[in-house]
Amino acid sequence: MKQKNTKNFGTRWGFILASVGSAVGMANVWGFPNKLGSNGGGAFLLIYLLFVFIFSYVGLPAEFAMGRRAGTGTLGAYENAWATRSKGMGKAGGLLGWLPLAGSLCIALGYAVIVTYILKALVDSVAGTLMTADTAAWFGEFSSTPFSVVPYHIIVVVGTLLTLYLGARSIEKTNKIMMPVFFIIFLVLAVRVALLPGSSAGYRFMFTPNWAALKDPMIWIWAMGQAFFSLSVTGSGMIVYGAYLSKEEDVVHMAQRTALFDTIAAVVAALVIIPACFSYNLD
């Protein structure tokens, strides 16, 4: 069995914000608005909320509990869980734990590139060069130039490794800053989009269910998959965070709060993107 963790997050809200920070990502900002727009609008939203509610009582608490009971990472948690069936099953569980771990590593590699591009865009926005540039030409120029974003990539990788090296308290402090900033930025954008002409059609699309769409099994499948991915269920992140959750905390309560703020992030992102698409007549 792997060495157990003996340090926890400093506060309840620190754990929740860190968990939300782990869950919120492309699945919320890009995936949810995209699937909402292409799968029936309000009908997809209702089904998605149903699955989020279910997973906040079943899947997410189970992963927090697995991590907390084992007090270690994904491999140790899977080994511990399978060993409860029989001693010989522990090794098999540890091997199975490599699947979500490998998946998380692949996602991290992709995110490192995406965050590098975002950092590049931030720097160019602050410098003013992006404000007047043709965005397609701007992206094409630096993405086709060898090593043009290497300095930004180094900053992203070093910053990530430093945060991880400093432990759970460092992740907690980072998310206490970054997650409120994330919500503030998207709320400001949502207000700005609400003032655009024609944006009201986007709100009607989002919140008026097409009841006939509920009969389409593919919409149910897409909504369930989106809820899985958005909450990071069946990954390794929530199991690892569970290892740093205090024994006094209620895992179901923590999972519900995590799911709530994760869903708010997804809906706010959709409130920015979908009405803007209707306003600018984008497909």
Enumerate the language-model features and the residues they cover.
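Membrane-interface "cap" regions at the ends of multi-pass membrane proteins
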Residues: 1-31, 59-64, 68-95, 246-250
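Membrane-embedded translocation segments of transport machinery
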Residues: 2-9, 172-283
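Inter-helical loop and helix-membrane interface segments of multi-pass membrane transporters/permeases
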Residues: 3-6, 35-39, 69-102, 112-168, ...
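Transmembrane helix-boundary motif of multi-pass solute transporters/channels
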Residues: 11-51, 201, 236-245, 253-256, ...
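Alpha-helical transmembrane segments and their helix-start/interface "positive-inside/aromatic belt" motifs
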Residues: 14, 41-49, 91-108, 172-182, ...
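Hydrophobic alpha-helical transmembrane segments of multi-pass membrane proteins
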Residues: 17-23, 49-54, 99-110, 154-159, ...
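Central hydrophobic cores of alpha-helical transmembrane segments in multi-pass inner-membrane proteins
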Residues: 27, 47, 52-64, 68, ...
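Hydrophobic alpha-helical membrane-insertion segments
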Residues: 51-60, 99-120, 181-190, 261-273
